[in-house]
Curated annotation (Swiss-Prot):
Chain residues that bind ATP: G130, T131, H132, G133, K134, T135, T136
This protein's name: UDP-N-acetylmuramate--L-alanine ligase
Disulfide linkage: none
Function per UniProt: Cell wall formation.
Top-level taxonomy: Bacteria, Bacillati, Cyanobacteriota, Cyanophyceae, Oscillatoriophycideae
Organism annotation: Microcystis aeruginosa (strain NIES-843 / IAM M-2473)
Gene that produces this protein: murC
Family: Belongs to the MurCDEF family.
HAMAP family listed in its UniProt record: MurC
GO cellular component, one term: cytoplasm
Length: 478
């Protein structure tokens, strides 16, 4: 287990460098809701920083050393009550002015994972890990516990309408948290219940190979009192021995499994089995077999906590999903617009397969995949896999790569991704610039299309523009 620094929750201030990020803001929100002094910097105001301000956090829209002085009060030099605990993510480097000032002044500096680990230790915690499905699974666990009256604290990597953001502070004994493996900090967490949805090589900026990823998950698994894991992942089935297992395949001998998966009237439906005994039918709003799997993990956890299956199933049936996870953004000119965070080849395959269910269920004419590759390192590592990831789409449009702050040391481009896709797909287009993508898509999209905007970058910003363009066209016709 990695050494976890001691975080002070007894009144010492917190200052977050880059407080508007999805992971940082969730932690800051919980601390502010606990009535702890919280400040942070982010270069531009967003609805996330506005929510933090509403919770009592002080937000600076500049990054400079003076920001650290907000809560500094007279007293013994560097007294625990007079200086802030400075919180950083992996994205913050030594050149950041606030980081430099905190280091030079001897202020305590923590990685955001240290704060999450300390919060996990404060509760009966459920931590959800895995290469894919973390946000949906952790959000759904939180939602089920909330609907069951257990009033959980929730920290996830996406925004959920049920608690109007990416975090909520409850008064119950449970904390549900999304546990990120991307930088190896997963090994700091020791929850009561750990969940592993699947394990694949991702984040090649940190991991050299799958073996290193497995080692990280192994260390996490050993620190969980109860491990819940999916046997549909070959890596898990081969290398892990979960306390509680689940699988979509009844032949794998898992504790929880399903049969008779169907798509009907906009819902995924499946019969659920617990150690060979029939529990009942489960309905899931968010499409795709991978979301049946995510929901099955939630059933396993709910049952372990003593919840009746009917309570769990009723909650699952009303869960609308997290934002940017097959999120319906609107309709215009007979075209349906979907925003999804998929950015790994496996995620793209799963999302586009789910879109096919939607096409059959809603009778859309075509599925149009608009994809923005995310990070140069990931694009380089999975270039060939991206080529074959779009087989379920009728048309593919690719943009240039969203860097996420990386340096392009391998000189990889979106054009190369497009070339790989064209080896497998005859209707693939490359349009690098987002600034003119909306106009380009006007020439491609047709009434009856399902337009899927895919990626973890800023591609989804084009969707409001598209909706506006179609409204303008309609106004001109009228």
């Amino acid at each position: 287990m990695k050494t976890v620094k001691k975080v002070n929750f007894n009144g010492q201030p917190f200052h977050f460098i880059g407080i508007g990020g999805i992971g940082m803001s969730a932690l800051a929100y919980i601390l502010a809701e606990r009535n702890l002094p919280v400040s942070g910097s982010d270069l531009r105001p967003t609805h996330i920083t506005q929510r933090l301000q509403g919770a009592g956090a002080h937000i600076f829209h500049r990054q400079e050393a003076n920001n650290l002085a907000l809560f500094h009060s007279p007293g013994p030099q560097n007294s625990s009550q007079t200086v802030p605990q400075v919180i950083c993510s992996t994205a913050i480097n030594d050149h950041n002015k606030e980081y430099q000032a905190a280091r030079d002044l001897g202020y305590p500096i923590f990685h955001r994972s240290d704060v999450l680990a300390a919060l996990i230790a404060d509760y009966d915690s459920i931590a959800v890990a895995g290469t894919h499905g973390k946000t949906t699974t952790s959000s759904l666990i939180g939602y089920v516990l909330l609907e069951a009256g257990l009033d959980p604290t929730i920290i996830v990597g996406g925004e959920v309408d049920a608690w109007e953001g990416n975090a909520r502070l409850g008064q119950g004994r449970f904390l549900v948290a999304e546990a990120d493996e991307s930088d190896g900090s997963l090994t700091k967490h020791a929850p009561k219940i750990g969940v592993i949805t699947n394990i694949e090589l991702d984040h090649p900026d940190h991991y050299q190979n799958l073996s290193e990823v497995i080692d990280t998950f192994h260390e996490f698994a050993h620190q969980c009192q109860i491990l819940v894991a999916c046997l549909d992942c070959d890596t898990i089935a081969e290398h892990f021995r979960p306390t509680i297992s689940y699988s979509l395949d009844p032949e794998k001998g898992a504790d929880y499994t399903v049969s008779e998966i169907i798509y009907e009237q906009g819902m995924m439906k499946a019969s659920v089995w617990e150690k060979g005994s029939y529990l009942g039918q489960m309905e899931v709003k968010i499409p795709g077999q991978h979301n049946i799997s995510n929901a099955l993990a939630v059933v396993a956890i709910g049952r372990y906590l003593g919840l009746e299956f009917a309570v769990i199933a009723d909650a699952i049936a009303t869960f609308a999903g997290a934002k940017r996870r097959f999120e319906h953004k609107g309709e215009a000119n007979g075209i349906t617009f979907i925003d999804d965070y998929a950015h790994h080849p496996s995620e793209l395959l799963a999302t586009l397969a789910a879109a096919k269910l939607k096409v059959e269920g809603k009778q859309y004419q075509r599925s149009i995949a608009i994809f923005q590759p995310h990070r140069y390192s990931r694009t380089t590592a999975f270039l060939e896999e991206f080529g074959s990831a779009f087989s379920s789409a009728d048309v593919v449009v690719l943009t240039d790569i969203y860097s996420a702050g990386e340096v392009n040391i391998n000189h990889v481009t979106g054009q190369q991704v497009a070339e790989q896709v064209r080896k497998h797909h005859k209707n693939a287009y490359y349009h690098p610039e987002l600034s003119s993508l909306g106009q380009f898509l006007l020439e491609i999209l047709q009434p009856g299309d399902l337009a899927l905007f895919l990626g973890a970058g800023n591609l989804n910003q084009v969707i409001p523009e598209m909706l506006s363009l179609y409204r303008e066209q309609l106004a001109v016709r009228v």
